[in-house]
């Protein structure tokens, strides 16, 4: 079973909203549209909240993985991976739509990871999503 993990984003609404709506940046919105279109289970990865269900209501916040102490990052990553394993014990592949810092922290604790956007800058990532919408 494949599960998609989507990066959170720095740009957010200024009021509480479901995780699927609170992030307003173009890259995060494109990744969410892609995840929905696949019909596969998907979650948002947040430095503050860990593995976030798209329906979970979040308050606006301003925390990224760069804000987490380096010694805490493996603990955070184990928590994210552990929650994923509880929710989807049959998950055999994670399709990661994450920034490099998040992926570097998480990869050792996840099932095999596919990174379809590896090496792509923001513009190329947006194009990748746009090509899959048409």
Q: PLM features: what roles do these ranges have?
A:
Residues 1-134:
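Peripheral peptide segments
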């Amino acid at each position: 079973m494949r599960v998609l993990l989507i990066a959170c984003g720095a740009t957010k609404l200024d009021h509480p909203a479901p995780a699927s709506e609170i992030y307003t940046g173009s890259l995060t919105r494109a990744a969410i549209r892609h995840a929905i279109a696949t019909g596969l289970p998907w979650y948002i990865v947040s430095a503050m909240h860990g593995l976030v269900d798209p329906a979970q209501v979040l308050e606006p916040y301003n925390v990224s993985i760069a804000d987490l102490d380096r010694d805490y990052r493996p603990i955070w990553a184990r928590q994210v991976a552990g929650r994923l394993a509880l929710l989807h014990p049959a998950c055999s592949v994670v399709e990661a739509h994450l920034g490099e810092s998040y992926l570097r922290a998480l990869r050792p604790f996840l099932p095999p990871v596919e990174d379809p956007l590896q090496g792509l800058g923001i513009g190329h990532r947006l194009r990748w999503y746009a090509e899959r919408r048409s």
